[in-house]
């Protein structure tokens, strides 16, 4: 099933997304859930944490997966995806270390891709992937190009991505990222795409044509049979 839902504002989008996440967790307490980071899913995660505490949901068997990470930044720096997930998911939920499958960020090479991919496979694959639409149409750090890599890989960051809000605190240029590939994302049993935020109208319009193109990596989600998109633009 492919569902496209227009939502009136960011708050409503985040509320609905958190309910969706909670439903997945309730139906499969040992779910493996891949999480994007950044401004788009921030309020969704806040609401999710709130609901889990209020409703005393058992999360002891859950596993979260970090979708991507900047390369060459120490993991503990403010702008990393790791710091984001630690602050907004891991610490508020009191997760054990083994409940987050996570890319390291320094001295990265392709063996890091193998390590993370193998850990996901051992858990039985992704049940849900939560994604945001990038200003240039990227998914994770799968950047637009003439061709896209299906598997987990180290990517060269698009010029627009190098100006990402999260990197404003980096204090140095960041030109590479490590990310799950499009095949990894499309292999998830369900995909939830959140489309919100300023400067994304062009990417949103191109995505909504439903024409699959390597120039808009997010367009590959139209190939997924169990895909929900919440839009507020």
Question: How would you label these PLM feature ranges?
Answer:
Residues 1, 57-130:
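Ligand-binding beta-strand-loop-alpha-helix segment within the catalytic cores
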Residues 1-33:
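N-terminal glycine-/serine-/threonine-rich phosphate-binding loop
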Residues 27-53:
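Glycine-rich N-terminal segment of FAD-binding domains in flavoprotein oxidoreductases
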Residues 35-40, 131-135, 196:
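Glycine-rich beta-strand-to-loop/alpha-helix junction loops that act as flexible
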Residues 47-58, 81, 144-154, 210-212:
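A glycine- and small-aliphatic-rich helix-loop capping segment at beta-alpha/alpha-beta transitions
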Residues 57-67, 75, 125, 139, ...:
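Active-site histidine-anchored catalytic micro-motif
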Residues 136, 140-182:
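Class I SAM-dependent methyltransferase SAM-binding "motif I" and its flanking Rossmann-like core
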Residues 183, 187-233:
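ATP/nucleoside-binding phosphotransfer catalytic cores, i.e., glycine-rich phosphate-binding loops
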């Amino acid at each position: 099933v492919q569902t496209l839902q227009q939502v009136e504002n960011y708050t409503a989008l985040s509320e609905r997304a958190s309910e969706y996440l909670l439903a997945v967790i309730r139906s499969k307490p040992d779910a493996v859930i891949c999480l994007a980071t950044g401004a788009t899913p921030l309020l969704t995660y806040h609401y999710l944490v709130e609901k889990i505490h209020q409703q005393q949901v058992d999360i002891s068997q859950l596993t979260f997966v970090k979708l991507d990470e900047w390369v060459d930044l120490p993991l503990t720096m403010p702008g990393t995806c790791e710091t984001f997930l630690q602050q907004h998911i891991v610490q508020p939920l009191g997760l054990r270390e083994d409940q987050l499958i996570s890319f390291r960020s320094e001295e990265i090479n392709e063996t890091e891709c193998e390590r993370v991919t193998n850990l996901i496979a051992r858990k039985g694959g992704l049940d849900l992937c939560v994604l945001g639409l990038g200003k240039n149409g990227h998914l994770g750090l799968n950047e637009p190009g003439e061709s896209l890599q299906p598997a987990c890989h180290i990517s060269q960051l698009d010029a627009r991505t190098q100006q990402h809000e999260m990197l404003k605190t980096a204090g140095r240029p960041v030109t590479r990222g490590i990310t799950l590939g499009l095949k990894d994302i499309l292999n998830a049993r369900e995909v939830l795409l959140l489309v919100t935020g300023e400067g994304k109208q062009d990417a949103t319009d191109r995505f909504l044509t439903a024409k699959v193109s390597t120039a808009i990596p997010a367009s590959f989600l139209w190939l997924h049979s169990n895909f929900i998109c919440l839009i507020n633009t």
